[in-house]
Regions:
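Sec-dependent bacterial lipoprotein signal peptides
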Residues: 1-19
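Acidic, polar-rich low-complexity tracts and alpha-helical solenoid repeat scaffolds
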Residues: 18-258
Length: 258
């Protein structure tokens, strides 16, 4: 990620400058054992991160925070610990560090990055949306926050794209549940789920089937005017769709039989 590469570069530059600016400064640092421990811990964290030992790296970054909690190194170290975990897919550990960062350093310039990485950690754990919505909802929450509160950042555009994908995922869950009720002949719960797709997810790829099912079920229940309403909507927007052809056949079945 661009921001993390930037943080790594800046951290290394600042580390070198702080240690080699001049002899007088080096002697001051040597006299301050706590600061030396902090610098050494950060250096070890960077080294271990580059070697791939992310657990030891994160431990060292956490040490920096403990040694110098009020320094500029503390929030950077917190973010580096989070990224270390994220880089090896330890999402829950990364989430813990990021939530801690946002609680302690909510006015930091890299807050937008923390929200983005937090959203990605939840997003990457979306596995079976039919069973668990927890990660989807969390990802949507943080991505929405990015788009609304940090619209001009480098992360906002990707956040918009991922929000569109989440919208599709949520619509697919509604369709799954609607079809579940349909297969079990639970008409009213099925209708309610299909209506939710029409009302809340009308820009997704699932809208055509939802409209057709509303034609089918309303016709089955003898609600022909309702069936016609959804058929007109389907025909107006998706006239070339196979779902419209099926709905047309349902409504003209009576005429074909006479």
């Amino acid at each position: 990620m661009k921001r993390v590469n930037y943080l790594l570069c800046i951290s290394l530059i600042l580390f070198v400058v702080s240690c080699a600016e001049n002899k007088e400064k080096i002697s001051v640092v040597k006299d301050n054992n706590l600061e030396m421990q902090m610098i050494e811990a950060y250096r070890e964290g960077i080294d271990e991160f580059n070697k791939g030992d992310i657990f030891f790296a994160a431990k060292k970054f956490n040490e920096v925070e403990l040694l110098y909690p009020q320094s500029i190194w503390a929030p950077r170290s917190n973010l580096m610990a989070a990224y270390a975990y994220y880089s090896q897919l330890y999402f829950n550990d990364a989430i813990y560090e990021l939530e801690r960062f946002l609680n302690k350093y909510n006015n930091h310039p890299d807050t937008d990055y923390a929200y983005y990485l937090l959203a990605i950690c939840h997003y990457n754990q979306i596995q079976n949306e039919k069973k668990d919505l927890g990660e989807i909802i969390k990802a949507r929450e943080y991505l929405t926050k990015l788009v609304e509160e940090y619209p001009d950042t480098e992360f906002a555009e990707d956040a918009k794209y991922k929000l569109e994908l989440i919208h599709e995922i949520l619509a697919s869950k509604e369709l799954y549940l609607a079809n579940y009720y349909l297969d079990r002949e639970k008409w009213i719960p099925a209708i309610n789920r299909y209506k939710k797709i029409v009302n809340e997810y009308d820009t997704t790829i699932f809208i055509e089937e939802a409209l057709y099912r509303l034609v089918e079920l309303n016709y089955k229940l003898g609600l022909e005017q309702e069936a016609k309403k959804y058929s007109v909507l389907l025909g107006y927007n998706y006239q070339s769709s196979e779902w419209y052809e099926l709905s047309y056949n349902i409504l003209n079945k009576k005429n074909q039989n006479t």
